Amino acid sequence: MANLWKKQRLRDTGLCRLGILFAVTLSIVLMLVSVPRTALNGSSIDDDLDGLDKDLEAKLNASLLSVARGNRMSLRLHRRNHFSPRNTDLFPDLAKDRVVIVLYVHNRAQYFRVTVESLSKVKGISETLLIVSHDGYFEEMNRIVESIKFCQVKQIFSPYSPHIYRTSFPGVTLNDCKNKGDEAKGHCEGNPDQYGNHRSPKIVSLKHHWWWMMNTVWDGLEETKGHEGHILFIEEDHFLFPNAYRNIQTLTRLKPAKCPDCFAANLAPSDVKSRGEGLESLVAERMGNVGYSFNRSVWENIHQKAREFCFFDDYNWDITMWATVFPSFGSPVYTLRGPRTSAVHFGKCGLHQGRGDEGDCIDNGVVNIEVKETDKVVNIKEGWGVRVYKHQAGYKAGFEGWGGWGDDRDRHLCLDFATMYRYSSSSASP
């Protein structure tokens, strides 16, 4: 009886060990299967960084090449920017009259999800290419993009974002001047802005990212560098109505006849709090920063003002455009829009309000935007006239800027972005 009990005990112990071994093996297999594609991509990218470095030598000027070589993540992002769009198997053909959509994002995932959800309901979105431009690399933002299945989508990542440079420029360096008057004491690097304040990488990244994105989309990507038509620009806290894409197509088609002097077409009024007039008339007004679109000829006009853009002491790209670039065109810069908005700015937390810092803005991203039946169909008619708004309030020539953009290093990096796709590596910063 004792022997029988002993055999049973040994058999149970063996089964228990076998069960533990099976569980451990299964856990390892599941862990390997669940490794994010981005991690695998990173591994494959690292395998060929030397080849990428040689490739960059032929494409970047010496200044940008020096910055990129100092950061392994920067090199990896350069490589990722050449990846083909996703979902080409689901949407193999793009419409010839497409308006490419570019989505400028940072790290506000709670907003980004809302914007992506609204895009998924936009009629005609499957006919075009969506480009998501990231300010550096944030895994949660990357996962949201990888979940998109409603159109072709391409990701680009700013490889010069201060967020990926922890101890060197464009991030924070140990030798940076930090407080007012530090530069007078010597032994620190950096120029103050017009108010005596030194650069904040988190702040300057807003303008750097926008300018890098514009130059990359118009001049650097295979998918868009030959695109002559309009490109629509939106941000991670913009809610698009279902009729947004069809409306912007209509506006860009009508613009040459209805408003030949208009530089752009907008989905929303320049006053972000307005939902529009609701009148039966098109509107020509100052260009807004919600759902704005323009074509390559306008981009060329903007690009010619790179020095004005890069040397204006304001960290906001839009205020820089209103106060110095647009006035330099020599005529009022009007945009054409409908009488009812097709896009809404819903964010409460600004891009300059980060996480983990004093004064952070907390918002769970829950929005309640009413979408009416008229917001689901094209609500712009070709027979309408155009109401022109002149002498609107807002930033104009003569405004000297809010500062935050006084460091010569930022200004010259900005100028380098303007030449990175137009000159060889022998070109130096202007």
Swiss-Prot record:
The chain crosses the membrane at residues 13-35. It is a single-pass type II membrane protein. Its main location: Golgi. It catalyses: an N(4)-{beta-D-GlcNAc-(1->2)-alpha-D-Man-(1->3)-[alpha-D-Man-(1->6)]-beta-D-Man-(1->4)-beta-D-GlcNAc-(1->4)-beta-D-GlcNAc}-L-asparaginyl-[protein] + UDP-N-acetyl-alpha-D-glucosamine = N(4)-{beta-D-GlcNAc-(1->2)-alpha-D-Man-(1->3)-[beta-D-GlcNAc-(1->2)-alpha-D-Man-(1->6)]-beta-D-Man-(1->4)-beta-D-GlcNAc-(1->4)-beta-D-GlcNAc}-L-asparaginyl-[protein] + UDP + H(+). One of its GO terms (cellular component) is Golgi stack. Disulfide bonds join 177-188, 259-262, 310-414. Keywords: Disulfide bond, Glycoprotein, Glycosyltransferase, Golgi apparatus, Manganese, Membrane, Metal-binding, Signal-anchor, Transferase, Transmembrane, Transmembrane helix. InterPro entries: GlcNAc_II, Nucleotide-diphossugar_trans. Glycans are attached at residues 41, 61, 295. The keyword Nucleotide-binding does not apply. One of its GO terms (biological process) is protein glycosylation. Residues 36-430 are lumenal. Residues 1-12 are cytoplasmic. It is found in: Golgi apparatus membrane. GO terms for molecular function: alpha-1,6-mannosylglycoprotein 2-beta-N-acetylglucosaminyltransferase activity; metal ion binding. Its cofactor is Mn(2+). PANTHER family: ALPHA-1,6-MANNOSYL-GLYCOPROTEIN 2-BETA-N-ACETYLGLUCOSAMINYLTRANSFERASE, BETA-1,2-N-ACETYLGLUCOSAMINYLTRANSFERASE II. Catalyzes an essential step in the conversion of oligo-mannose and hybrid to complex N-glycans. This is Alpha-1,6-mannosyl-glycoprotein 2-beta-N-acetylglucosaminyltransferase. The gene is GNT2.
